[in-house]
């Protein structure tokens, strides 16, 4: 009995140390955005090939090849700064995600859509929360926008939380708006207006 009690105490001490270590690691995590270059093809391919596709649009090729990465990077080179902001997400010096804000057109030209993807092993580290904050600031400064919109499948709670932490408001839910394979999802419409603080 005494031995079991000692093991339980040791377990609790180790668990507490592990939690403190994770919290410290999150504090020290440095997240930056960088412009994509052609030299980043393999990093982009790795991110898109390993992406959890449950809540992504089907337009992203699967498998995602180096040729797909090349095509996308060429498109970004033409559009960046004019029709959107397209960045690699860098955490502790390594490219771990992709994030963009793409302008809409016609009567929606003062609006843009936010999109992002992060390697699954990097989830729950605060990386995308920081990346969204940074790209929204850049997009409002560079693209003459009144708002940024984000569309999220209703069950994607982690992504919704990222947006809410960055001052996005849930503006509505489009019922049965997404059909992916055999699944039907509601689509949450989030918005952030120029000048709104977190």
Question: Which role does the model predict for each range below?
Answer:
Residues 1-12, 16-21:
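Positively charged N-terminal leader segments that act as targeting/secretion signals
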Residues 2-4, 65, 127, 135:
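Generic signature of intrinsically disordered, low-complexity, basic-rich segments
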Residues 9, 58, 70, 89-92:
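Intrinsic disorder/low-complexity segments
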Residues 17-54, 86-198:
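Acyl-donor (CoA/ACP) binding surface of acyl/acetyltransferases
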Residues 53-75:
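Conserved GNAT-fold acetyl-CoA-binding loop/helix
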Residues 74-88:
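A short helix-loop-beta-strand connector motif used in the catalytic cores of GNAT acetyltransferases and
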């Amino acid at each position: 009995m005494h031995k079991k009690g000692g093991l339980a105490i040791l377990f609790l001490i180790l668990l507490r140390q592990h939690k403190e270590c994770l919290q410290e690691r999150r504090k020290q995590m440095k997240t930056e955005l960088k412009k994509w270059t052609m030299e980043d093809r393999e990093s982009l391919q790795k991110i898109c090939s390993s992406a959890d596709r449950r809540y992504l649009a089907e337009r992203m090729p699967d498998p995602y090849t180096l040729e797909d990465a090349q095509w996308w990077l060429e498109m970004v080179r033409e559009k960046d700064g004019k029709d959107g902001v397209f960045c690699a997400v860098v955490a502790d010096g390594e490219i771990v995600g992709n994030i963009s804000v793409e302008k809409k057109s016609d009567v929606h030209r003062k609006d843009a859509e936010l999109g992002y993807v992060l390697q699954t092993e990097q989830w729950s580290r605060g990386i995308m929360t920081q990346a969204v904050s940074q790209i929204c600031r850049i997009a409002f400064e560079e693209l003459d926008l009144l708002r940024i919109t984000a569309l999220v499948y209703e069950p994607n709670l982690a992504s919704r939380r990222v947006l809410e932490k960055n001052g996005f408001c849930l503006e509505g839910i489009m019922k049965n708006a997404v059909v992916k394979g055999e699944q039907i999802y509601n689509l949450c419409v989030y918005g952030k207006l120029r000048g709104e603080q977190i």
